[in-house]
C-alpha cells in the first residue's frame, strides 16, 4: 500500500492544545454500527465482566532540557546509566565536548549524529539521571502543542565550550508554552510506575482512579506491561512505499505474572482490551503461536494492513495523525475502509485529536 492511502484532511483546530477539564470528561467514540459518541466516564457500559484491560505503566520523564541561548534537547533513549540519545534544537549550535552546568551537575555533548540527533553524558553528584530531570527538566510535550503564553528558560553564562545555567529564569521571546504544572499531572497516567518514556502512552490519560475502582468492582480485570515510548513515535513516514519505512526501536517488558494473566484470559475466551497502541505493539511483539511470552526486549514492530493479530480483541486509542504508523496500525486492526469512515465521522463531530484529544474503542476486524 502507498503512504497516500492513509491520508485524510484534518482541520488544525481539532488538534487538542490542552487536556479536557477532567480526565474522564473527554469524548469516546465506540466503533459499532451505528457509531456511538459518548463520554469516557461511560466506558464501563461498553465492557463486561471478565474482560481484561492491559495497560502500559511506563512513566513519562521530564525529558526536555533547556540549555540556554534558545537551545533545547529532548532525551530519546537510555544508552547506559549515564548516557542518552537525544534530539537537539537547533543542533547546529551544539558541538562535541560542549558542557552545560546545572549547579554542580554537568551535561556533556559526546556525539553529533544525523537529523538533529545527539548523544549526551550526565556527570551528576549523588543523584540519578531521573532525579536530575525531575529538578531541571520539563515535561516533553509534542511539537504540535503550541500555546500563546511565554515559556521561561534559565539564564546562561558561557565561557568557551562551558555554559553555566542558574535558577534565575527569564522568558523566551516568541516561543509557545510547552510545560505547565497542569501538564506535569495530566501528561501522565494515574497508574504510571516505571520511569522511561519521553512521550505519554496517551490512551491511558483518560482513566481516573475512580474509573479503575469501578471497573474492578464490576469484575473487569486489569494487568500491566511496560513500553518506554521514544521520541521516534512522532517521526513521519517519508517513503511512499510504506514497507520501506524503518521503525524506531523501543524497550518493552512483560512480567511472568502479566503473561500468565493474559494467557489464562485468552484460554478462557475472555476479551483482551489493549489500552493504547503501545500496549498492542508490545503484546504482538511478545506473542508466539498465540502465547504471550514474559521477558524484556526491544521492539521495532511495524503493523500495517494484512498483519495477523494474535492477542487483543479490542483496542482503546486516541485519534492519530494522517499518514502515521499509528493510523496504519488501527487500519490493520479494525479495517482500512472502516477507519477512514470513522475518522470522517470524528472530524464532522469536531472530536479532538492527538495526545490531549478524545478516544475511540475499536473492535478487531
Curated annotation (Swiss-Prot):
SUPFAM superfamilies: QueA-like. Pfam families: Queuosine_synth. Signal peptide: none annotated. Keywords: Cytoplasm, Queuosine biosynthesis, S-adenosyl-L-methionine, Transferase. GO terms for cellular component: cytoplasm. Pathway: tRNA modification; tRNA-queuosine biosynthesis. Belongs to the QueA family. This is S-adenosylmethionine:tRNA ribosyltransferase-isomerase. It comes from Rickettsia peacockii (strain Rustic).
Amino acid at each position: 500500500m502507498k503512504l497516500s492511502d492513509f491520508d485524510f484532511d484534518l482541520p488544525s483546530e481539532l488538534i487538542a492544545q490542552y487536556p479536557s477539564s477532567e480526565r474522564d470528561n473527554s469524548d469516546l467514540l465506540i466503533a459499532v454500527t451505528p457509531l456511538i459518541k459518548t463520554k469516557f466516564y461511560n466506558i464501563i457500559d461498553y465492557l463486561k465482566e471478565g474482560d481484561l484491560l492491559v495497560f502500559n505503566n511506563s512513566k513519562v520523564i521530564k525529558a526536555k532540557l533547556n540549555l540556554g541561548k534558545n537551545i533545547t534537547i529532548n532525551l530519546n533513549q537510555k544508552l547506559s546509566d549515564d548516557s542518552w540519545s537525544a534530539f537537539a534544537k537547533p543542533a547546529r549550535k551544539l558541538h562535541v565536548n560542549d558542557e552545560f552546568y546545572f549547579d554542580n551537575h554537568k551535561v556533556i555533548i559526546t556525539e553529533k549524529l544525523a537529523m538533529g540527533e545527539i548523544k549526551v553524558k550526565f556527570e551528576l553528584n549523588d543523584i540519578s539521571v531521573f532525579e536530575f530531570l525531575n529538578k531541571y527538566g520539563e515535561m516533553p510535550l509534542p511539537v504540535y502543542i503550541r500555546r500563546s503564553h511565554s515559556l521561561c528558560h534559565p539564564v546562561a553564562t558561557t565561557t568557551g565550550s562551558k555554559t553555566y545555567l542558574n535558577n534565575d529564569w527569564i522568558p523566551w521571546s516568541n516561543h509557545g508554552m510547552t510545560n505547565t504544572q497542569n501538564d506535569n499531572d495530566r501528561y501522565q497516567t494515574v497508574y504510571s510506575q516505571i520511569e522511561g518514556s519521553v512521550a505519554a502512552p496517551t490512551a491511558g490519560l483518560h482513566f481516573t482512579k475512580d474509573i479503575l475502582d469501578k471497573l474492578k468492582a464490576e469484575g473487569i480485570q486489569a494487568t500491566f506491561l511496560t513500553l518506554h515510548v521514544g521520541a521516534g513515535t512522532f517521526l513521519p513516514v517519508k517513503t511512499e512505499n510504506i514497507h520501506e519505512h524503518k521503525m524506531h526501536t523501543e524497550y518493552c517488558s512483560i512480567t511472568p505474572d502479566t503473561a500468565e494473566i493474559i494467557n489464562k484470559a485468552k484460554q478462557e475466551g475472555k476479551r483482551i482490551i489493549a489500552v493504547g497502541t503501545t500496549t498492542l505493539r508490545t503484546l504482538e511483539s511478545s506473542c508466539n503461536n498465540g502465547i504471550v511470552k514474559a521477558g524484556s526486549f526491544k521492539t521495532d514492530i511495524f503493523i500495517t494492513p494484512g498483519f495477523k493479530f494474535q492477542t487483543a480483541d479490542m483496542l482503546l486509542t486516541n485519534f492519530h495523525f494522517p499518514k502515521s504508523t499509528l493510523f496504519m496500525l488501527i487500519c490493520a486492526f479494525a479495517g482500512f475502509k472502516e477507519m477512514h469512515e470513522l475518522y470522517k465521522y470524528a472530524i464532522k463531530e469536531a472530536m479532538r485529536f492527538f495526545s490531549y484529544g478524545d478516544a475511540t474503542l475499536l473492535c478487531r476486524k
